[in-house]
């Protein structure tokens, strides 16, 4: 079946069939001669058929055996990973699609499954067979009590279910409904026969106005979507799933003349579905390069880093993609951290990317498959229309329980006579659906063949006779199957599946001629377009890659492309019209004839199509104007500026260059005219939010001025449209966070679904992405069914504990059990939030005092730490092991030392989470080894390696002794721990800490985990009056507090603060925190003036929105809180990560870093941050970005996505217990050799 490419499978006796005409009558096309069609379209069809899925499994599980031409059935692969009882027919050694679906559905419906959709199997009990809904049901808001109910008999491995809201529902009175089409004014139009049949079927009571209104809305929707005749009759509808490369939730509608399938696809306009680092190889050097990949609606873009997202190195239009797939060797599963190649095959070429591991590769490919599928269907919906007279065979097979698999074999059209297969999965009432279809076929006087699992020669003859009769019928009354697919795929009949990649790729390369408008690839771009693994691919693949690379190389550097580039330059220099207008409304605004307006409608249409093609834009994007100019970014790049309805784009036209810019209007702040860098040129500066300005040079003032006018006019229209569509009374902060919270909830649901897909893949070896229908009136909610027991382990200060409380509360909302393990003094605070608590050894104030005394890691620090904290480390290891019992998932701050060993013993998923740079990277130095000036990537990477070795050597003796005596594990080493392979969560904003391209896929910068406590906080009346009086006096209000820092002379620090506040003429809210914690004084030793109010501890989310600046020590949590609310920040770092964040605040331009703290430096900094408008505006911009992030939801999403990978790491480690009780084995003076590590002295 070719109508929806990713949900089709060819018939048994015939091969690939033609894609069906779209539903719009004007777009219908009849293909008379299938043999003359393009082979690239053939491959596009094959790329999305379930037959390719089956044959690909066959290639990986058993040797390929050609099928004899006389055999009528498609060869079905043997799934060695499935137990015999999971197959549809145990006696057959080749499972059919039913066998695969049986294994798949077992995870959805059985009581002893890993995961499933709980409500689906129970639909028969909730809805009678005669009760038929139209698929447009109420928006379910499940009762909280029902969310907490679980089946006591269910196996504890079950961890997924949808909310208990069946697919077949009724609409309540509050549910919005599409309005029916209004009647004609001239004559009251009676209901058509089709409308009457829908109303009669769906409303038992004639007086039920709501049901009738719903029925009319459904009939109008079906008529508009499927072009249903008024004389047709509605029979019934059923919820079902369409099977193919994806499993799509939707509805089956049966009428007197047609079988209809319809589903709403998820809508994510402009949002990023997935992003991360991937490795590419350049040609011909085969050097590896790390790039940043971003997956959006219809595009897969590659950038040089995660911050410069306006200049893609490569943009793949997924509307031209055939498929995405993984290439893995037999050793991949044995080593979960081994890199794996993936490839995206398009109509013109193949793109190779190296993922960090198999889990990452599967995540990328699954997301790509969903996007490719969605991009090939019109209007965010999937629609299939099958005339009943085209149906040849119905085959219903049982899967598990009431779950049925329906195979519909149809003749595509009277022109091609190709046979397509549609596979539908019913979780209830599958027999009733088949009965309805058979009844309407029988009533129409037609006949079909009832397929079985095996066929004899006589039965095959009957099928042939039936096929001939069907063809004769179609010749007399032509009809064709129609789908919402954007492309028409020809029918090519083959005896063997077209799965030879070499033949496919050669055809793809030769099928598309070089276009005059094709973007010429730069060196960096070219290296991305053809990737070839060296070790794990077959020789045939390598040879094919060489052919493709040579073909692309010839294309890129051909004489034709060179001449085209030179011609473009010459025309740009010499053309009397260096600009062109394409929108009629601007010509009217000028009040006179626009000499630059392109009057030919066909030329305007062709230019718009080229514009969309160049930048892979949506079909709704309009071209407004174009200009020839230079982009001055390093070396000036000559090219063309395109102004669209939503973006400003640039494309270089020089031969050998491939600079592309896609800049949304929403990110442009202003446009200014300037003088050009070169004599005779005019400049235009585009000011971008949070990004360096872009400078363009034009050959004339006229072109520059026209570009400025058009750009400002289009920006005003864009912003006006955005303002009109936004809520009128929403505050800036609340609207930012609420909108992004809704988006994060969608991402979280996708992560739950991905976690479900991972468990299915690990059990049955299939990787079929699942798409949940985004119905406008009802929503299928995927929620965790199993309650996992999370343990969050950390040591340190209040700032180290607070993020875990925020994460713990969110995990509890997901239905999990959470326990925080940390120092005893935080127990009341943690329990106040309803989180379980367990204590470990250690006094955090002593740790703070040691760190303040030794701001950097040096010999004296190691010596003092070893003498003071040796016994504490022993106690920490023992108490942590006891506290982490009965744990399913462990999340630990890596400074706690012991978590990775506990996870190895318990064989559970293990994650690390921290607030400062801790993983190896060239982008940032280690937080404890930050230099006074930037020393480059080599130094940064060295600091991480040196710290890892030093930190391990300082604790290795005690850790290994504890492993052997307490855990029963053998000794380990830095290399054997493989801590750089552990999934890592940075609870820091990507705005403050942009993820580096050399971060592994399992290293995620999630965003801050904020704990909002302002709702329960009652501020003292004195504090509120202090703030009000400062506002009346026209004075700036600043916050000064140093949190958990312990200082030896607190009175001197207080006096410096007092003098600085008076000097700067501001009002101060003071919070000394732990600054005098180790002292004996209980009251402030310095008398505070009226300009300073000693507030003590105040929730940041209550205080910071009301102040003008903040002064603090630069801890991650406090820095995030001040930046979150757009407050200019002054940081005086004392130790550790504080120096790192002080530098980041200065780099962002939203604050000041103090090297020395005295009243003069502090006063000067206070004046700077309260009066410098640049710092104030920059802080507001950074705050808006941080408020748009949802760190906690992103963290949970990452946990779900990486859970199976984290589990595989723990399981893959050594399990053999080596018990050594002799104390001689642990000699303190013995220098232990650590394999694979080194220490820089």
Curated annotation (Swiss-Prot):
Protein name: Sterol 3-beta-glucosyltransferase
UniProt region (Disordered), positions on chain: 1-97, 124-189, 499-556, 720-741
EC number: 2.4.1.-, 2.4.1.173
Feature: compositional bias, Acidic residues: 1-11, 136-155, 516-527
Sequence similarity: Belongs to the glycosyltransferase 28 family.
Gene that this sequence comes from: ATG26
Domain GRAM as annotated: residue spans: 220-267, 609-675
Compartments (UniProt record): Cytoplasm; Preautophagosomal structure membrane
Composition skew (Basic and acidic residues), residue ranges: 25-34, 540-549
């Amino acid at each position: 079946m070719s109508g929806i490419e990713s949900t089709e499978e060819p018939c048994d006796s015939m091969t690939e069939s033609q894609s069906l005409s779209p539903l719009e009558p004007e777009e219908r096309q009849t293909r008379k001669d299938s043999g003359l069609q393009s082979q690239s379209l053939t491959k596009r069809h094959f790329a999305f058929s379930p037959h390719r899925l089956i044959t690909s499994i066959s290639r990986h599980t058993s040797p390929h055996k050609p099928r004899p031409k006389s055999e009528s059935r498609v060869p079905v692969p043997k799934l060695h990973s499935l137990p015999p009882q999971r197959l549809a027919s145990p006696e057959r050694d080749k499972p059919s699609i039913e066998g695969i679906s049986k294994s798949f559905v077992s995870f959805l419906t059985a009581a002893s499954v890993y995961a499933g959709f709980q409500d689906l199997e129970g639909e028969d009990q909730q809805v009678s067979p005669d009760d038929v809904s139209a698929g447009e049901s109420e928006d379910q808001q499940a009762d909280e009590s029902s969310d907490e109910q679980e089946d006591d008999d269910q196996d504890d491995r079950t961890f997924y279910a949808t909310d208990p809201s069946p697919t077949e529902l009724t609409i309540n009175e509050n549910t919005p409904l599409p309005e029916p089409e209004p009647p004609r004014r001239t004559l009251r139009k009676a209901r058509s026969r089709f409308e009457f049949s829908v109303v009669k079927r769906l409303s038992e009571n004639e007086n039920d106005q709501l049901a009738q209104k719903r029925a009319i809305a459904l009939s109008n929707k079906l008529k508009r979507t499927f072009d249903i005749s008024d004389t047709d009759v509605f029979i019934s509808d059923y919820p079902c799933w369409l099977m193919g490369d994806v499993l799509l939730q939707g509805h089956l509608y049966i009428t007197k003349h047609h079988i209809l399938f319809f589903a709403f696809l998820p809508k994510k306009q402009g949002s990023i579905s997935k992003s991360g680092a991937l490795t590419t190889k350049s040609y011909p050097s085969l050097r590896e390069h790390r790039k940043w990949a971003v997956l959006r609606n219809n595009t897969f873009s590659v950038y040089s880093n995660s911050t410069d997202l306006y200049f893609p190195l490569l943009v793949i239009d997924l509307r031209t993609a055939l498929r995405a797939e993984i290439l893995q060797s037999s050793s991949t599963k044995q080593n979960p951290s081994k890199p794996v190649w993936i490839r995206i095959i398009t109509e013109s070429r193949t793109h190779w990317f190296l993922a960090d591991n198999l889990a990452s590769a599967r995540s990328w490919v699954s997301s790509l498959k969903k996007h490719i599928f969605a991009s090939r269907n019109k209007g965010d919906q999937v629609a299939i229309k099958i005339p009943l007279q085209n149906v040849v065979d119905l085959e219903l097979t049982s899967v598990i329980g009431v779950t049925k698999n329906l195979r519909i074999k149809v003749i595509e059209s009277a022109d091609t006579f190709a046979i397509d297969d549609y596979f539908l999965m019913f979780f209830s009432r599958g027999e009733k659906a088949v009965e309805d279809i058979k009844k309407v076929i029988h009533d129409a006087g037609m006949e079909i063949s009832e397929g079985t699992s095996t066929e004899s020669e006589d039965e095959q003859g009957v099928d042939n006779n039936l096929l001939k009769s069907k063809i004769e019928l179609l010749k007399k009354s032509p009809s064709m199957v129609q789908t919402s697919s954007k492309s028409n795929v020809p029918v090519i009949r083959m005896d063997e599946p077209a799965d030879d990649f070499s033949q496919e790729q050669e055809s793809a390369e030769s099928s598309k001629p070089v276009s005059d408008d094709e973007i010429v690839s730069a060196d960096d771009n070219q290296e991305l377009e053809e990737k070839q693994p060296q070790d794990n691919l077959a020789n045939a693949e390598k040879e094919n890659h060489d052919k493709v690379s040579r073909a692309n190389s010839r294309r890129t550097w051909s004489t034709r492309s060179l001449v085209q580039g030179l011609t473009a330059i010459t025309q740009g220099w010499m053309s009397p019209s260096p600009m062109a207008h394409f929108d009629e409304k601007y010509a009217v605004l000028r009040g006179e004839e626009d000499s630059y307006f392109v009057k030919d409608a066909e030329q305007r249409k062709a230019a718009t199509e080229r514009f969309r093609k160049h930048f892979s834009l949506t079909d709704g994007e309009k071209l407004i104007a174009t200009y020839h100019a230079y982009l001055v970014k390093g070396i000036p790049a000559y090219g063309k500026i395109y102004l669209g309805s939503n973006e400003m784009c640039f494309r270089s036209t020089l031969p050998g260059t491939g600079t592309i810019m896609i800049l949304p209007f929403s990110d442009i702040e202003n446009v200014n005219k300037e003088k050009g860098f070169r004599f005779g040129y005019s400049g235009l500066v585009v000011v971008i939010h949070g990004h360096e300005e872009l400078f363009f040079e034009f050959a004339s003032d006229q072109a520059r001025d026209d570009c400025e006018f058009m750009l400002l006019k289009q920006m005003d229209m864009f912003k006006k449209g955005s303002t009109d569509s936004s809520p009128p009374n929403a505050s800036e902060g609340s609207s930012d966070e609420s909108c992004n919270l809704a988006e994060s909830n969608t991402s979280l649901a996708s992560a739950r679904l991905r976690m479900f897909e991972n468990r299915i893949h690990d059990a049955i070896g299939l990787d079929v992405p699942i798409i949940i229908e985004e119905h406008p009136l009802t929503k299928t909610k995927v929620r965790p069914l199993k309650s996992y027991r999370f343990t969050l382990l950390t040591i340190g200060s209040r700032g180290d504990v607070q993020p875990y409380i925020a994460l713990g509360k969110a995990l509890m909302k997901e239905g999990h059990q959470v326990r925080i393990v940390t120092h005893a003094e935080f127990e009341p605070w943690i329990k106040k939030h309803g989180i379980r608590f367990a204590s470990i050894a250690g006094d955090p104030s002593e740790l703070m005092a040691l760190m303040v005394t030794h701001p950097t890691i040096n010999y004296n620090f190691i010596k003092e730490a070893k003498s003071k904290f040796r016994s504490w480390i022993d106690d920490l290891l023992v108490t942590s092991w006891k506290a982490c019992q009965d744990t399913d998932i462990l999340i630990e701050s890596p400074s706690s030392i012991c978590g990775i060993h506990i996870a190895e013993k318990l064989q559970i998923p293990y994650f690390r989470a921290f607030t400062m740079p801790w993983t190896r990277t060239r982008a940032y130095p280690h937080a404890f080894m930050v230099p006074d000036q930037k020393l480059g990537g080599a130094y940064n990477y060295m600091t991480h390696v040196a710290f890892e070795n030093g930190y391990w050597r300082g604790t290795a003796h005690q850790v290994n002794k504890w492993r052997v005596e307490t855990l029963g594990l053998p000794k380990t080493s830095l290399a054997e721990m493989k801590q750089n392979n552990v999934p890592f969560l940075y609870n820091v904003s990507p705005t403050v800490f942009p993820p580096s391209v050399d971060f592994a896929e399992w290293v995620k910068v999630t965003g801050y985990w904020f704990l909002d406590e302002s709702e329960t906080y009652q501020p003292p009346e004195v504090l509120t009056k202090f703030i009000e009086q400062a506002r009346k006096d026209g004075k700036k209000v600043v916050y000064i507090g140093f949190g958990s820092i312990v200082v030896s002379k607190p009175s001197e620090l207080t006096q410096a603060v007092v003098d600085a506040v008076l000097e700067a003429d501001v009002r101060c809210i003071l919070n000394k925190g732990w600054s005098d914690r180790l002292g004996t004084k209980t009251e402030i030793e310095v008398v505070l003036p009226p300009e300073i109010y000693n507030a003590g501890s105040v929730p940041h989310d209550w205080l910071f929105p009301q102040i003008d600046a903040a002064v603090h020590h630069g801890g991650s949590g406090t820095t995030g809180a001040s930046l979150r609310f757009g407050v200019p920040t002054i940081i005086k770092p004392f130790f550790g990560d504080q120096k790192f964040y002080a530098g980041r605040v200065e780099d962002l331009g939203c604050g000041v870093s103090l090297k020395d703290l005295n009243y003069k430096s502090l006063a000067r900094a206070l004046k700077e941050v309260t009066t410098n408008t640049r710092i104030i505006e920059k802080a507001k911009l950074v705050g808006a970005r941080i408020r748009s992030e949802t760190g906690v939801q992103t963290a949970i999403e990452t946990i779900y996505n990486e859970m199976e990978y984290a589990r595989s790491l723990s399981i893959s480690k050594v399990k053999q217990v080596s018990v050594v009780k002799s104390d001689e084995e642990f000699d303190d003076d013995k220098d232990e050799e650590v394999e694979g590590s080194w220490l820089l002295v």
